[in-house]
Amino acid sequence: QGMFGCGMLQNIFSTYINRPTVFKNKEALANTFVPNKISYREEEIRHISNILAPLLRGYQASNIFIYGTCGTGKTICSRYVVAQLEEAGKNRIKCVYINTKLKRVGDTEYRLLNRLLRELDEIMPDTGLPTDILYRRLVTAVEDRGISLVLILDEIDALFKKIGDEFIYSLTRINTELNRARIVLIGITNDLSFRDRLDQRIKSSLG
């Protein structure tokens, strides 16, 4: 048979599938992986959980600001807790993780709001809309659903460098317009001095 003939009797990937691998679970290497259990961070997990727990009863929870050196488990602990929270809250809690350092995600206020609305299954037009309209759509989306939205903003210092602090302040102020819904922010940074450089109104809103 020729190179593209029909003489093959088995799937060309069968060798790959049956070949031994050194990985027990290769998915664990992915940035999006959240383990079923985290060791040696029980106190931190308990602290985050206690802050977010009121959402399960429909109450407002405080925003959270987490900072520490790289590799200390800030992101994985936060994602672990909110995954558990989302599971416990069933359809009443929606958790969204955004690494704001990534290009075309956290480099403009519009793209961040667009991403949030898409996570809520909102149909977004291809053409741009004014950010004030996107804020109104976000308020309507969470209020109509009656959900608590937990938003993790990783590398939040990169977000401030790109678009300033008005986005965070505006998000925290949305709660004043909500009755059935809640929005909680979790900001994460490796920059230990970042919080000291924030405007006082942002400090108080982030907790």
Predicted regions located by residue number:
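Conserved beta-strand scaffold positions in the cores of enzyme catalytic domains, especially
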Residues: 63, 95-97, 207
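A generic secondary-structure signal
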Residues: 50-55, 84, 140-141, 173-174
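Short glycine-rich or small-residue beta-strand-to-loop segments that form or flank ligand, phosphate
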Residues: 65-69, 98-101, 157
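Mid-core helix/loop region of P-loop NTP-binding domains shared across ATPases and GTPases
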Residues: 9, 13-24, 30, 61, ...
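Walker A/P-loop nucleotide-binding motif
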Residues: 59-80
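A short, basic N-terminal segment
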Residues: 3-60
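Charge-rich, low-complexity intrinsically disordered linkers/tails
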Residues: 82, 87, 192-193
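AAA+/P-loop NTPase substrate/partner-engagement loops
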Residues: 86-116
